[in-house]
Amino acid sequence: TEGMVIMFKGSHIARARYCSSSGGKTEDIRHVWFSAEKQYLKGVWDGETPLELDLSKEDDLKKFLDSDYGEDNIPMNKKHRWSVTYRQEELDEIVNKSLNIGTIHSIEALARGVSGRIYKAVFKGSGGTETVYGELNIRKILNNMNSSAFIVSKGEGIWTFSGAGWGHGVGMSQMGAISLGRKNKDFKYIMKRYYPGTEVTKIY
């Protein structure tokens, strides 16, 4: 691969973002860094066959989380699907390190990207309400959650976060690339898969 770069439209070197695990679908760059849309950094499905699900909708995201779709469920990938549980007092302590809103009553997703990652959420508590923008900010408030592609459920004093993936989800999924490599796909195939519209070009 010496002297090779990923080019877009033959003249621009692509900004090859990547994440640890997409969870099954990568994310549009505009929903993560709120920057200009890039054609080669749009959400793509990890599996060979795209699903007919809109992961920005919670009902479809739940179906997705209940599946093993994408990245071929690599044994080393502990973040493809995950679940985190907190007692009420634990969650209160975690959230109030960042937001001074008292006892947490609800956490609601106001906007999700194409991979189901939340990029706008509202936290409601006994002492106030805070709207948070940005998937990384949301994850940081929640004790550095694996990703913001999660659904929240609340039981009797117990909160459960069920999610997919690890990281922002933009660009190549490292776990997905490992899966494709194990299927004898070469690096050019993998790059085109995760950065649509690009070509691997030798420049020296």
PLM feature spans:
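Conserved, single-site charged/polar hotspot
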Residues: 1-204
